[in-house]
Amino acid sequence: RMVELIKRGEPAVMLCHWPGMYTQGTKKGFTAFKRVVETLNSRFGDQTIWMKLSEIGRYWTAKELTRITFADRKISLNAPFGAPKFTVRVPGVVATNSPPRFIVENQTVALQGVTETRLLRSGTWHADSKGLVMCFDLPKGVSQIQW
């Protein structure tokens, strides 16, 4: 099922319980888990982001509760929770001559362009046939992206 979810670009979550990992001291469950992780990394490493459960919870809480408004080459975000490596896609937007700018409390930071979506890290952006993708550390409160 993990492979199906990853191929479709959907979130795929594995949850392991410590008793099952250690299998009464034999660590057979842990060995099996490591094998699954290695296999997924070898096949889907470019499209997989490993996160702890707390990181998933923070990201999805920010995703669901952040108010996002679009207006003329600008996105305004009002986030009740911050989230590192927050990613926004703006469909249909093509690359511009100047990089997108991330603005928080009157401080502006130009995002750095990357050549492929898989290279996105916090503070970067990429334009592809689907639009503009930007990744940044979303702060609690109000912020903007302009391009």
Model-predicted regions and their roles:
Residues 35-83:
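Extended hydrophobic/aromatic segments used for targeting, binding, or gating
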Residues 1-55:
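Catalytic grooves of carbohydrate-active enzymes
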Residues 63-147:
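C-terminal beta-sandwich/jelly-roll accessory domains of carbohydrate-active enzymes
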